[in-house]
Amino acid sequence: MNTLRAGKLQFSISDDAKEIAWSADGLPLRESRSADFWRAYMDDNYRREMRVRSCLQTYGHVEVIDADHIVVHYDKLVGDDGREFDTAMHVHITANVSTYPGFEMYAEIDNHDDARLNELQLPMIDLDTACDTAREKDVMYRMNGYGDIQPNPWAAIKNNHTEYISADDKQIWCVMPYPANCSMAWFGMQTGGHFLYLGKQDTRYETQLFTTGVSPRGCDPQLVMTTSQLPYAKGGETLTTMRCFVSLNEGDWRTGSDIYGNYARANWYTPPTIPDWVKDMTGWQRIICRSQYGDVNFTYADLPRAYREGQKAGLNFLMVFGWWRGRFDNGYPVYEPDDELGGADGLRAAIKEIQDMGGRVALYTNGQLIDVATDFYREKGHRLCRIDIDGNEYRDHYRFGNAGTSIRTFGYKSFVTACAGTPEWIDLQLEHEDLKFSFGADSAFYDQIGAFAPMPCFCEDHPHGNRPAQQEEGRRSCLKAIHARCPEGRAIGTEMATDVLLPYVHYIHGAQIGPIFYENAFPAMLLRTFPEMVHTDRFVHDDKPGVERLLNHAFIYGFRFDVSPWRGRTDISSMPLLTGLVKKLVDLREQYREFFYHGTFVCDTDVELPAKVRKGEFLAPDGVRRLITLWNDNPTEVTICVGEESVTIAAGEAACVCLN
């Protein structure tokens, strides 16, 4: 066996490249039976996703470059059914010994077959046991949104069995697309006092899948951690995949955050320069002037009154949707002031009145949807939209209904999604930016372009050419152009967080797990890795039972409040209970404003927490003082020791402890 070592972790492979082994010094970690370290999936347009496993290859051999670098060569690839593909592949594996040692892996693909190589899962960590023989103690830290925690993934992933539509008899998969579900391109597992990390280590930005899997029902235990790259390599094409990194270190998820964050800062991440007024944003009311179904919720003249109602809750920002004539979620991408709502001058006057009260206003446009019932689609949009693997347009169907039941059941609106890097689309977004700022808005907000719908685009006429997964680079190009055009002192916002896009926006309207609360949400994964960004929470729509939990969750992590009464149909004045809850937390945050608004989210102070008590932490601008934020999600009060402080927190309440 040929063995590479990186810290405690070892990877071994036989000369013929059929057998591999994972091990770790002093730990029970070992590979599963007939383990793979990569899998590929071929496609001849008739047979889809023909699996190719590393353990079944017959044309492989290992070349030892030096003690830290091997190349695994395959002259041909062989499918599960014995079909041979005239596809050569060369997998580079390098042991990287640094602060966090690990293995860097990537592949060179040279395809001469009629079948296309759609997907390559590399690296693949295919285990029978990790670092604890009690498998149920393992915890997966997934990049689900801003991050979440999955206890006992060996059992939990079984719940992803599709029962019908997928080949669960071969593997049960839990898939997280990047971007969209994933805000960052890494994840890992806490196991036996160590953190097993897998992440991208490359400057390229492509659609990617981060995946965990377990064995089919009735089979021996197996847990797989991998990432799928999507080369879509056709016959006659040669390409190199992105580099990825595997590492095992003593400690917890913070080692993964360090590995990814350190690489990003050294290679592609520059923190955005955010205006102070954005940092000082307490939250906003998000309202819709003209609804999806044509009703008028607010005229332009109503906007100052709506803002004043938000002020009573401590909110200092108004996010305005549906301000154009065509109706919200209709007519995209055409935006014109609505004369019935007050016309261009009325909109400009309303914004000025809010600003005179000390408020800020953002105007919405959608960054990627094209309404197929428009002249724009018929004349241009059909050329700019993303195309699927069969040559069809991706379609998105909205079912926003009014008081009836038919539209909410059957829908009425269809969209295609723009391939964001097409020059005409970028030019159009710049026109929209100029339009929004022409009314005096403080911010131009672009919905969805931050991550939504990361579908590969198979239109080779677009700038990504014959690399469908590289359509994601178009998002970066588009937002980079928008950001560069933004006047000084104003701001660009978008919906959903993706790490590579953070340098080109000033705030994120949260729409993933993290800003959206659920029991296992753990947004500290993103917030610690890239702490500079301003984020809002999501789904505070009314004073429903449990809304206090959403607000307390947002509070401890520093999310600004996104309050959208009745989903933008009214203002907060109709909800005095919600007004009081928001105001209470805004006032508490104000007592520690230097931490919340101008500090840095960190995770340095370990505190022993009772069950259902959650924690955040902020470092003051002086780099010394710390604020510990706590939320007691129990039905009874709890007492917690934080450093030398003892704090008692009432049931369902949030509290702060300042450490000097």
Which residue stretches match the model-derived regions?
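Short, hydrophobic/aromatic-enriched beta-strand segments in well-ordered soluble domains
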Residues: V72-K76, V91-A95, A107-I109, M225, ...
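Polysaccharide-binding surfaces and accessory modules of carbohydrate-active proteins
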Residues: L9, L29-C55, E63, H69-G79, ...
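A structural motif
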Residues: L315, G440-D442, F559
